[in-house]
């Protein structure tokens, strides 16, 4: 029955990678054959140069021509394979680029969808209000820091030159007082109570009448 109806081919189609590798392998085989033919041509060339013109040399030339024809055939086949491989590489690159583009577009669509969902929870007015509030708080904090860092200054009336002059005059007054006799000095303000009883030179209390007699 299989001979009449055949068998369905369920094998998967080769991929571009597989086809490219296969052609690359065949190109390698062609290169080996071409290199081998080049070695034969070199050998025939030496024989032709070493042989005198005549039937023997002509026979060697005929063999060399056949080898050269075979080499040309392999080179044409190799060039065709190289062109096919280049086209397949271009197709592979274009296919991969399209896949990358599809993946990128899909990811961007999902990203846009996620952004729309997240933006529903954010309002620009709320962001502006928050920024204004933060700026106000920072300004207020700066004012507090400036107030705390303010230096305490002496009144403007206390000039340094005036203080220096006062200090010099105080020194002169102190020197004058030190050199002046005690009886010429201005009496100091009494510190005792006038109604308090007086005492004599021995420390004994003096009566009021006695005090009047002394006066």
Swiss-Prot record:
Residues 188-199 have a biased composition (Polar residues). It comes from Dictyostelium discoideum (Social amoeba). It is found in: Endosome membrane. Disulfide bonds: none annotated. GO terms for biological process: late endosome to vacuole transport via multivesicular body sorting pathway; protein transport; vesicle budding from membrane. One of its GO terms (cellular component) is endosome membrane. Probable peripherally associated component of the endosomal sorting required for transport complex III (ESCRT-III) which is involved in multivesicular bodies (MVBs) formation and sorting of endosomal cargo proteins into MVBs. MVBs contain intraluminal vesicles (ILVs) that are generated by invagination and scission from the limiting membrane of the endosome and are delivered to lysosomes enabling degradation of membrane proteins. This is Charged multivesicular body protein 5. The keyword Protein transport applies. Belongs to the SNF7 family. Gene3D superfamilies: 6.10.250.1710. It is a peripheral membrane protein. Residues 29-81 form a coiled coil. Keywords: Coiled coil, Endosome, Membrane, Protein transport, Transport. Probable peripherally associated component of the endosomal sorting required for transport complex III (ESCRT-III). Residues 186-215 are annotated as: Disordered.
């Amino acid at each position: 029955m299989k001979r009449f109806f055949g068998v369905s081919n369920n094998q998967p189609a080769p991929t571009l990678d597989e086809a490219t590798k296969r052609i690359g392998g065949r190109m390698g085989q062609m290169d080996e054959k071409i290199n081998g033919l080049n070695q034969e041509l070199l050998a025939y060339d030496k024989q032709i140069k070493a042989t005198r013109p005549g039937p023997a040399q002509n026979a060697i030339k005929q063999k060399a021509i056949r080898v050269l024809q075979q080499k040309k055939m392999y080179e044409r086949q190799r060039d065709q394979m190289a062109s096919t491989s280049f086209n397949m590489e271009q197709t592979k690159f274009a296919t991969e680029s399209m896949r990358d583009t599809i993946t990128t577009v899909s990811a961007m669509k999902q990203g846009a969808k996620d952004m729309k969902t997240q933006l529903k929870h954010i309002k620009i007015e709320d962001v502006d209000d928050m920024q204004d509030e933060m700026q106000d708080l920072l300004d207020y904090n700066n004012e507090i820091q400036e107030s705390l860092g303010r230096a305490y200054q002496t009144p403007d009336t206390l000039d340094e030159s005036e203080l220096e002059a006062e200090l010099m005059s105080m020194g002169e007054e102190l020197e004058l007082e030190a050199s002046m006799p005690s009886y010429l000095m201005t009496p100091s303000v009494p510190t005792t109570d006038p109604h308090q009883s007086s005492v004599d030179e021995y420390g004994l209390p003096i009566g009021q009448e006695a005090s009047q007699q002394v006066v």
